[in-house]
From Swiss-Prot:
Keywords: Cell membrane, Cell wall biogenesis/degradation, Glycosyltransferase, Membrane, Transferase, Transmembrane
Any one GO MF annotation of this record: chitin synthase activity
Localization in the cell: Cell membrane
An annotated GO cellular component: plasma membrane
E.C. designation(s): 2.4.1.16
Chief place of localization: membrane
Organism: Ajellomyces dermatitidis
Biological classification of the source: Eukaryota, Fungi, Dikarya, Ascomycota, Pezizomycotina
Residues annotated as signal peptide: none
Entry protein name: Chitin synthase 2
Length: 189
């Protein structure tokens, strides 16, 4: 759940940044209403129970209601939808409006079977993309911690030039507290 909360909390910080852009024609205080976070878990048996607990704590997931067969037909995925008012930081502390965080619209798709990453991308684009018709899609792997303004800068690349079809952000290795992560040769390189 640490990897998940690191990513989700980073997204929530970015949503707060979008909403702080009061002079923007697009964003502003209600900018969170223009953002939908889609979380796709690849396999009900594979997703870590603590990640599901984190989603439940945010109000997104309800344990015990997913069934693998309905009307004698196998279920492919379970979809949960919720607008959460709280973020769960990597230390598993709740942050909400009292800390300046904005609400976040979340769609959580729990796939019944582990069918790998490309299948999850198909779910995102074919199912949710068609339903939501977004102007911009940003894909993040779990564990990626976006900087507080990173998603805004990615969005801005699309906003400034309608010919832009893709953009990539810079990835930096987390050095850890006191830069202790640098003792790991993979991080240090």
């Amino acid at each position: 759940e640490i990897h998940f909360t690191r990513t989700m909390h980073g997204i929530m910080r970015n949503i707060t940044h979008f909403c702080s852009r009061t002079k923007s024609r697009t964003w502003g205080k209600d900018g969170w209403q223009k953002i939908v976070v889609c979380i796709i878990a690849d396999g009900r048996q594979k997703v870590h129970p603590r990640t599901l607990n984190a989603l439940a704590a945010m109000g997104v997931y309800q344990d015990g209601i997913a069934k693998n067969i309905v009307n004698q037909k196998p279920v492919n995925a379970h979809v949960y939808e919720y607008t959460t008012q709280v973020s769960l930081d990597p230390d598993l502390k709740f942050k909400g409006a009292e800390k300046g965080y904005k609400p976040c619209q979340i769609i959580f798709c729990l796939k019944e079977r582990n069918e790998k990453k490309l299948n999850s991308h198909r779910w995102f684009f074919n199912a949710f993309g068609r339903a939501l018709t977004p102007n911009v899609c940003i894909l993040l792997d779990v564990g990626t911690k976006p900087a507080p303004t990173a998603l805004y800068h990615l969005w801005k690349a699309f906003d400034q030039d309608s010919n832009v079809a893709g953009a990539a952000g810079e990835i930096k290795a987390g050095k850890g507290k006191g830069w202790l992560g640098l003792f790991n040769p993979l991080v240090a390189s």
